[in-house]
Amino acid sequence: VAGARQAVGEARRIVVKVGSSSLTTASGGLDADRVDALVDVLAKSRSGGEKEIVLVSSGAIAAGLAPLGLRRRPKDLARQQAAASVGQGLLVARYTASFARYAVRVGQVLLTSDDMSRRAHHRNASRTLDKLLAMGAFPIVNENDTVATDEIRFGDNDRLAALVAHLVHADLLVLLSDVDGVYDGDPSTPGTSRIAEVRGPDDLAHVEIGSAGKAGVGTGGMVTKVEAARIAAAAGIPVVLTSAVHAADALSGGDTGTYFRPTGKRSADRLLWLQHASTPQGSLTLDDGAVRAVVERRTSLLPAGIASVEGEFSAGDPVELRDARGRAVARGLVNFDAKEIPQLIGRSTRDLARELGAEYEREVVHRDDLVILHP
């Protein structure tokens, strides 16, 4: 653990995510003192010029509650978006004033999961963040709550933070919350202890992780944080999950929170968003042979292996690949429009090319555009 923590302290490019409960008062409004305390840590951590930090910050909806006369976070999307519209400006204004104490400029970046799943948007977001860092500005990222629909919302900023960490090729992801790590039981119960290190999913197989956030102003609990940590770790990025009051220790490599070891290698950007940020526009049901070929042998999906098609999608859209029981086994970018596929079902590419033309002698989903969901 000591060696891993040393590597954490030496990380150069870091994504830090802070949740609503770490930025708000007991009544749910934005707490200027807590914002200042976080900014103190972040500004000092990057003051030597050796670290670049991107902040993924919740709090827009929470910041908009009091000005709109709302006592608690609304459940309906329209009022959440109204609160975010008012609160996002207040949130960034608070950060701008706080960072100004260190003569640091703030840059606002608002994203939706749609931005992460469209290649051009994804590429532009990456360039913007890189340029902000190169120019010495401090990027503050949030979900664009005012335009996100139910279908394309992240639902929490934890998953967004994991994807941003991958997007900017971060050396470390730090998830700050109101709990100082993952525990082997309910943290409020005597006798439970903090889990210092998670080497892989099996380490948490017998741990019951609660689902609700403490303060009632955010959407994420420990479940979403652990899931985000797993996404980042699977993409080769180490993660520290701890409380906001221990942020300085986390950034310096101190023994705080729960450390998630990287479990995989860095994958292509688009495959990570394909698995975790894309919204499938339809599905293809495969026969048993095609499921084995795609999942076990990692081959491309050919027309011969398709049993049925559902949904309305265009070539290039993400679709789910399902087995005969309806279980999603993979996700991929389809090479045909939905209306073209019925005439291809169960047929060989050679026959299709002979009958319909050479452009039909291709895979329905190429193996380079596939991610396996259930091996």
What role is predicted for each listed range?
Residues V1-R105, V109-P375:
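C-terminal catalytic "cap/lid" subdomain
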